[in-house]
Each structure stands twice: as structure tokens, then as C-alpha cells.
């Protein structure tokens, strides 16, 4: 027999983010990690129409900024002649609007579970066997979060002619689990990496999915923050992680001798062998995390 099941999973809920204000402080624009900048409306006391960086005075197009990667501060970590290598130029602009960075990052995951079973017995019913193979492929809504498991099991029973009954089972599982760092974090870089910690405070005017995350030459993290002070969440996904590989072999055998209908002798032997390899890593090129951005 073959059985297959398919499920999806998704982020249960996310904060009720405001979608009215973007980067900055005191209704003034700046490439910070705050949401106290100008409004996404052009008019009014806090409107972007009062901001030279957004109203077209600097960018040449109202409602647009110069792209964060071609700003003067960011030229120190991303030379301007390298911009074409990531699809940008000195004329690239950034639209002043609310972005759904959390929704863009956490996409629905999927779970596929497949089981194949063979079983049979002899004509007289004294010998029977069972073989089962299972495969689980679980991709979470967090990018880079996966669990894959293969399981194989054998079982059998034989009633011998000399009043002895033998039973045996053999089970093997291999589990491969991978995830980016997702625990609570208190800084913005490599010393305390956390995908969740570096995503949920993202300003509304920053789109994570729309910003390249890796330096075209060194592979280091690049991001919108002035002087590159925050590690790009997508760089975290692709360059950091925790991995666990588990192998387990277990089962047992038993033999029973029937002395009479009401009396028997039984011998059982069981075994369970387990190994686990754990790896935590981060590639070279992360941000030093000098900005404290408490999350969690």
C-alpha cells in the first residue's frame, strides 16, 4: 500500500504594523531602523512633500528617494562602480511607500508525507513479515527551515515446528534538520544573529525582498542602513544556520518456547543506537552588530 499526505503551514499571526510612517525621526527622513519619519502621504505637517530627500529636490522624481545603496554614506562599503553588478546604478531610485517585508519573507510552507508498506504471510499463517518505508519532507514558512526524515522498518514472525516462536523488528531513521537562527536577539549583526530579531522591527519604507543582500565581490552583507550597520535578513538566511543530522537504529528479537498450553519460556533482546551531529555556522562577511535592536 502507498499513502501520501500533503499539508501547508503558514505564520499564524504577525504584529499589526502601522502603514503610515517610514524611516526617520521626528517626521524627518533618515536611513535608520525607526518608523518615526515622514508620512506616506504627500501633504500635511508630516507629509513627504516637506522632505527634500523625497519630494524630488534630490532624486528628481517626487515620491522617490535616491536608492540607499548609492548614498554617500554607503559608498564606503559598496563602491559605486560595483552597483551594476547588483542591477543598480547611480540613477537608481527607491519609492517612498509602505512595504510588507514580513509578509514577503514568511511564505507558506509545505509538508509531504509518503509511506509505502509491504506485508505478507505464508499459506499456513506461520510465517509473516512487514516492510515499511516512510519519507517526510517539511519546508517551514521560515525560509531555510527544513526537516527531512527517511524511515525504514522490517518486522517478522515465525512459528517453528519445535514449539518455538521467533519475532524480530529492525528500524532505522535518518533525520536532517536545518534552520537559520531564529531565537530572541539583542543586536543587529553576526554576534547575535536572529532572523526573527532582525525582521520584525524593519521600517515600513524598507522592502527586504527588493534589496540585494550580498556584496557582488566579497559576498558580505549589504543593507539599507547608513554605513551598513544592520545585517540583511536574507544574508542571514543564506549564510548562517543550525544543522542537526540524526541517525537511529533500534529494534529487538525474541524467542519463545511453549512448554505447555499454560507455560512458556521467553527470551528478549532489544537495542537502540543513536548518533547526532550538530553544526552552527556563520560565513565571513556578517555585520559586527554594533546597533542594539532588542527583539524578543
Question: What are the functions of these language-model segments?
Answer:
Residues 1-3, 111-115, 128, 132-139:
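A beta-strand signature from Gram-negative outer-membrane beta-barrel systems
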Residues 125, 132, 155-157:
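Outer membrane beta-barrel translocator domains of Type V secretion systems
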Residues 116-120, 154-158, 251-257:
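Residues on the lipid-exposed face of transmembrane beta-strands in outer-membrane beta-barrel proteins
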Residues 104-109, 120-122:
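Outer-membrane beta-barrel initiation region
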Residues 111, 123-125, 159-161, 258-260:
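Outer-membrane beta-barrel channels and translocator barrels
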Residues 124-129, 163-166, 262-265:
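Repeated loop/turn-to-beta-strand initiation elements of outer-membrane beta-barrel proteins
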Residues 3-95, 140-145, 151, 155-248, ...:
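Surface-exposed loop/interface segments of Gram-negative outer-membrane beta-barrel transport/assembly proteins
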Amino acid at each position: 500500500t502507498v499513502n501520501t499526505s500533503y499539508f501547508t503551514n503558514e505564520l499564524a499571526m504577525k504584529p499589526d504594523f502601522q502603514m503610515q510612517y517610514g524611516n526617520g525621526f521626528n517626521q524627518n527622513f533618515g536611513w535608520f531602523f525607526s518608523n518615526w519619519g515622514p508620512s506616506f502621504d504627500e501633504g500635511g505637517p508630516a507629509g513627504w512633500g516637506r522632505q527634500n530627500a523625497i519630494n524630488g529636490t534630490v532624486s528628481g522624481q517626487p515620491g522617490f528617494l535616491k536608492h540607499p545603496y548609492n548614498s554617500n554614506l554607503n559608498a564606503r562599503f559598496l563602491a559605486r562602480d560595483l552597483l551594476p553588478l547588483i542591477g543598480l546604478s547611480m540613477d537608481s531610485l527607491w519609492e517612498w511607500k509602505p512595504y510588507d517585508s514580513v509578509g514577503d519573507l514568511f511564505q507558506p510552507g509545505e509538508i509531504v508525507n509518503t509511506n509505502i508498506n509491504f506485508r505478507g504471510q505464508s499459506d499456513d499463517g506461520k510465517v509473516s513479515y512487514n516492510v515499511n518505508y516512510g519519507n517526510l519532507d517539511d519546508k517551514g514558512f521560515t525560509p531555510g527551515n527544513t526537516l527531512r526524515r527517511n524511515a525504514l522498518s522490517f518486522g517478522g514472525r515465525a512459528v517453528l515446528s519445535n514449539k518455538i516462536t521467533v519475532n524480530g523488528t529492525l528500524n532505522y531513521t535518518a533525520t536532517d534538520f536545518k534552520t537559520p537562527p531564529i531565537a530572541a536577539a539583542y543586536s543587529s549583526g553576526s554576534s547575535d544573529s536572529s532572523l526573527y530579531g532582525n525582521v520584525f522591527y524593519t521600517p515600513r519604507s524598507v522592502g527586504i525582498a527588493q534589496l540585494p543582500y550580498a556584496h557582488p565581490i566579497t559576498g558580505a552583507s549589504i543593507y539599507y542602513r547608513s554605513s551598513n550597520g544592520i545585517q540583511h535578513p536574507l544574508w542571514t538566511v543564506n549564510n548562517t544556520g543550525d544543522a542537526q543530522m540524526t541517525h537511529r537504529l533500534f529494534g529487538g528479537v525474541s524467542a519463545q518456547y511453549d512448554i505447555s498450553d499454560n507455560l512458556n519460556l521467553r527470551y528478549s533482546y532489544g537495542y537502540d543506537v543513536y548518533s547526532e551531529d550538530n553544526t552552527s555556522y556563520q560565513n565571513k562577511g556578517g555585520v559586527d552588530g554594533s546597533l542594539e535592536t532588542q527583539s524578543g
